[in-house]
Amino acid sequence: MNVVNVVPMHLPPPPPRPRGEQHVSVLGREVLAALSPVSEGVYVDATLGAGGHTATILETPGARVIGIDRDERALAIARARLARAGDRVTYVHGEFSEIERHLAALGVPQVDGLLADIGVSSMQLDDPGRGMSFRAEGPLDMRMDSSRGETALELIERLSDEELADLIYRYGEERRSRRVARCIKQAADSGELVTTLDLRRAVVRAVGPARIGGVDPATRTFQALRIAVNGELDQLEALLEAAPRIIAPGGVLAVISFHSLEDRIVKRALREPEVWEPLTKKPVTAGDDEVEGNPRARSAKLRAARRVGGAEALA
C-alpha cells in the first residue's frame, strides 16, 4: 500500500469570513425580476434559509410563499424575520426533493414560481458548530439537517481509501484525490481526525499550503464531503424532475448554483423546449457592487426558465 509521509504541521486557521458575507441572499433583485411575482400568486422558496429571498417576493402585495428548509435553525430565524407577513408564509421543515409530497399535504396542486438557492448558506458556513467550514474549529459534522443522517466523520470512517478518493474526485473535482484520501484516512486511523481544522491539516499535508491569494487547498475536499453527506446533487435532480409538474404553465423556475457540478445539472434540465423557455441565453451573475458587498456572490449563477405547454408536454 502506498503511504504518504505525514509531516506534523501546525497551521493557523484561515482568516475569518469577511463581514460582507454574513447571511446575505445573493442575486435578490435578479431573482425578483425572473419570478415577476403577482398579487395572489403562490411561490415556493425551496431553500428558505434566513428568508432573504422570500422577503423580496413578499414585497409584492398579496403574494404568498411556501418556504421549505431542512435546517430547523434556519426556519426559526426565517419565522422571526418574516413574522409581519403572517399567514402569507407557510413554513415546511423538510427536503426540497420531496416537494410534491409537501405541496400535496398543503392542498396546493401547482404554484406560480419556484426558487432554489442551492448549496450551503453563509449562515451555516459561519456557524462553527455545523462543521461546514475550515475557517474555524468545529465538529466534523456538515449535515444541513443535524437531526438525522451520518456526519462527515462517520462517512470518512465508513469509506475505504479508494471510495473516499472517488468521492473527493467526483464531488470536489480534486485531481489529487487519492493522495488527499490517504492522508485523511491515516489521520482518522490514528485518532487525529476529530475537527474541521484536523481535516484541513490532513489535506494540506497531502497537497501543500495555498499560494498567496489562492484558494484554500481544503476547499474542494470540504465541498465534496458536504455534498455527499447531504446528498445535494441527488436532491437537486429530484427537485428539477418534479418542477414541470408543480409549476403551472406560465410560471417560472429560478435556480441559483455556486459550482459547476450544480450548474451542469440545472443547464441540462432546462434543455427541454417543450417544457421550459429560458429567460436568458446565459446564466445571470452578480454585478461588481454586489460582489464587493457580498464576496459569496462571485460564484453565483442564476438560471431561470418559464414553464410552457400543459400536461401533454410531460407525456
Swiss-Prot record:
Region (Disordered): 1-21, 281-315
Keywords: Cytoplasm, Methyltransferase, rRNA processing, S-adenosyl-L-methionine, Transferase
Keyword check for Methyltransferase: yes
EC assignment: 2.1.1.199
UniProt-annotated binding residues for S-adenosyl-L-methionine: 51-53, 69, 96, 117, 124
Chief site of localization: cytoplasm
Transmembrane segments: none
Catalytic activity: cytidine(1402) in 16S rRNA + S-adenosyl-L-methionine = N(4)-methylcytidine(1402) in 16S rRNA + S-adenosyl-L-homocysteine + H(+)
GO cellular component: cytoplasm
Compartment(s): Cytoplasm
Keyword Transferase tagged: yes
UniProt function note: Specifically methylates the N4 position of cytidine in position 1402 (C1402) of 16S rRNA.
Name of this protein: Ribosomal RNA small subunit methyltransferase H
